[in-house]
Design a protein with these regions (language model features):
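ATP-binding Walker
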Residues: 11-12
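ATP-dependent small-molecule kinase phosphotransfer cores
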Residues: 32-119
């Protein structure tokens, strides 16, 4: 039903936040299921092309942005949307805001240009912006764990670049820069500082999720009756096809 993205610079704690958010949603709310994902997709050919273009520095920013957009559109409509229609919550480590910052601001393509390239992608219902001091982020990266998970060399090699990325997120997600259409429709919360204990971080994320979900926002990417139709279809199939609703394409199971 809801797509929730977690954004922030490398080493800020996005992976941890994604894990915690999924745990909170699964434990405290009544979604049919909670699924985690990430962009770019390291286990998909389109995602690998995008990652390799950065590692090899083989393309100009526009080419890189095109590969990230292609991966995102396929991910949006081939994987995420079907799950949202089933009433599931999807938590994505990185989504559209990463492209807006990395290619639009840092890569100097411009926000409108990158937004246009991604205009057919899903819009996160909630974006959680995670932040920490760049010095702390670099220590986490240099500790080895993040480097191993990130296939060594990608975007996060220098402290100067870390500062530029952090400033990009700050300018975009704080409202200093206008969020381009259609990605201005979702809710945005942050910065959520991840500089102390995990328990403190968890408390902050729990408060955010409760505030968001208790407000009962309408989903951006699916209609409420999409979820109802899915569950009705499942119910009718479970009754061994004894009922038929032609308007939702059901046939009796013989």
């Amino acid at each position: 039903m809801y797509l929730i993205s977690v954004e922030g610079g490398d080493g800020s704690g996005k992976g941890l936040a994604t894990k915690i958010v999924a745990e909170i949603l699964d434990k405290e709310f009544t979604f049919t299921s909670v699924e985690k994902t990430a962009e770019p997709r390291r286990d998909h050919p389109l995602g690998r092309l995008a990652i390799d273009s950065v590692k090899m520095q083989s393309l100009k920013p526009e080419g890189e942005a095109g590969l990230f957009a292609a991966d995102r559109l396929d991910h949006s409509h081939g994987w995420i949307l079907p799950r949202l229609k089933e009433g599931k919550a999807v938590v994505s480590e990185r989504n559209i805001h990463s492209s807006l910052v990395y290619q639009g601001i840092v890569g100097k393509l411009g926000l409108e240009r990158v937004a246009h390239m991604n205009s057919a992608a899903l819009v996160p219902d909630l974006c959680i912006w995670v932040d920490c001091d760049p010095k702390i982020a670099l220590k986490r990266i240099e500790g080895g764990t993040l480097r191993n998970l990130s296939d060594k060399k990608e975007y996060f090699e220098t402290s100067e670049l870390q500062k530029e990325i952090r400033e990009g997120y700050k300018n975009l997600l704080s409202g200093k820069l206008d969020m381009p259409t259609p990605f201005d429709m979702g809710a945005l919360v942050g910065p959520i500082l991840n500089e102390t204990s995990e328990s403190d971080f968890r408390k902050k994320l729990t408060t955010i999720l409760k505030n968001f979900l208790h407000s009962k926002p309408l989903p951006i990417n699916v209609k409420s009756n999409d979820v109802e139709i899915y569950h009705l279809r499942e119910l009718l199939y479970s009754l061994d096809g004894q009922s038929t609703l032609e308007n939702i394409g059901l046939k009796k199971i013989r």
